[in-house]
Swiss-Prot record:
The gene is lamB1. HAMAP family: LamB. The keyword Signal applies. This is Maltoporin 1. It comes from Klebsiella pneumoniae subsp. pneumoniae (strain ATCC 700721 / MGH 78578). GO terms for cellular component: cell outer membrane; pore complex.
């Protein structure tokens, strides 16, 4: 009899649990998992690995941090052409010096990078257009080998993107990117609210194998009445950044040219390798700047490819004591595949920058970097990742600025191992 009761109990429990388990399973959406990471170990000519001017000399063998991004997203609703997608991302950065790196003593820093909702299918006539709101990386334009986003208006905001118009698509966004600790005189109220209007048009192909994108970013510092009463740095004008780029299929790869103009607080991006942050820490109402970028990835042979980034930037009056700033940077990375998984990588970079001041003096910066590495990757493509690299680098300050070995040397070397991945 006990056996019969036990059997009935199990059957009843199964009958009660099954519907709820089925419902729970049906209610759980698919989770998309994406991310990025880099980490490693290295030494230099004087202690731990050195990092110097990587946005102008190249990042290979010139990165000393541990960095990661973890992204979780899910389409939480889908019916016909209508979908609701939730996205989230956190990041972590540290110097990689310890086993357990926490926020204690700023050993590691964690950040909330993305938290947004993307709605598709509610705009009449274009089921692929997206209405979005929240915090996100917004259509960032990347130069990977120098770790620079030359067009990057990211943050909390809202907008409509990829609405088909003619041969391309238009995107319009309102994004917030505040400036912190602007002026110590305004105690407890030194952060300035800055709002951006970002308008882009992408996808027009003027001829076969080409594609374009154009955009305007309008930055509006939104000071409080208390900040206005202090004047000074808080008397910041609205600024604009214009971007136009054209890309072309070339020899099995591509080439891209970017032209940019910026003024006011956005002008300094043209010489700092920035992507659109507004400078509230200098007097910049008369500032103007220009930038030209050429980049490409060309397969020279079946096994050898070259990726390059050439940047020329010019800016005037980006501080109250600076007249002109000129910057030139060239970085090239070559890659030879021994097998599908083993490659030899070389990277060479050089830059020159001159700041001319209103008092007639000037300050020059220049340098070079040479790196050779053995890479192990999950395929033969140039950007195949994950990748493990064993590298050696030589860095040199040709203006004798002595940035290395406690400001006693104008050159140093790095040796180490780094892994990089995205998924």
């Amino acid at each position: 009899m006990n056996t019969t009761l036990r059997a009935l109990s199990v059957a009843l429990a199964a009958a009660l649990i099954a519907p709820s388990a089925f419902a729970a399973t049906a209610a759980i959406p698919t989770i998309d998992f994406h991310g990025y990471m880099r980490a490693g170990v290295g030494v230099s000519g004087d202690g731990s690995e050195a990092e110097w001017q990587k946005n102008k000399l190249g990042r290979l063998g010139n990165e000393s941090d541990t960095y990661g991004e973890l992204e979780l997203g899910s389409e939480v609703y889908k019916k016909d052409d209508v979908s609701f997608y939730l996205d989230s991302m956190v990041s972590m950065v540290s110097d990689g010096s310890n086993d357990n790196e926490t926020t204690l003593n700023d050993d590691a820093q964690f950040g909330l990078r993305q938290l947004n909702l993307q709605i598709k299918g509610l705009i009449p006539g274009d089921p692929n257009a997206v209405i979005w709101g929240g915090k996100r990386y917004y259509q960032r334009h990347d130069l990977h080998i120098i770790d620079t986003k030359y067009w990057n208006i990211s943050g909390s905001g809202a907008g409509v993107e990829n609405y088909t118009l003619g041969p391309g698509a238009v995107s319009l966004a309102w994004i917030r990117g505040d400036a912190n600790d602007v002026d110590y005189r305004v105690d407890g109220d030194s952060n300035v609210n800055i709002n951006y209007i970002d308008l882009r048009y992408a996808g027009w192909k003027p001829w076969a194998g080409s594609w374009t994108e154009f955009g305007i970013d309008y930055a509006m510092p939104n000071t409080t009445k208390k900040q206005d009463s202090y004047g000074g740095l808080y008397d910041a004008d609205n600024g604009v950044m214009l971007t136009g780029e054209i890309s072309q299929d070339m020899l099995g790869g591509y080439n891209k040219t970017v032209l940019q103009y910026a003024n006011k607080g956005l002008a300094q991006n043209m010489v700092s390798q920035g992507g659109g942050w507004y400078d509230m820490w200098n007097y910049v109402n008369d500032a103007t700047g220009y930038r030209v970028i050429n980049t490409g990835l060309i397969p020279i042979t079946e096994k050898f490819s070259i990726n390059h980034v050439l940047t020329w930037g010019s800016a005037d009056d980006i501080t109250d004591y600076t007249d002109k700033t000129r910057m030139l940077s060239l970085v090239a990375r070559g890659q030879y595949q021994f097998t599908d998984y083993v490659r030899l990588i070389g990277e060479v970079g050089g830059f020159y920058q001159k700041d001319s001041y209103n008092n007639g003096t000037s300050y020059k910066q220049a340098g070079e970097k040479y790196t050779i590495a053995l890479g192990l990757a999950d395929g033969p493509d140039f950007m195949s990742r994950p990748e493990l690299r064993i590298f050696a680098s030589y860095l040199n300050d040709s203006e004798d600025g002595k940035p290395f070995e406690d400001q006693t040397a104008n050159n140093t070397w790095n040796f180490g191992v780094q892994v990089e991945a995205w998924w």
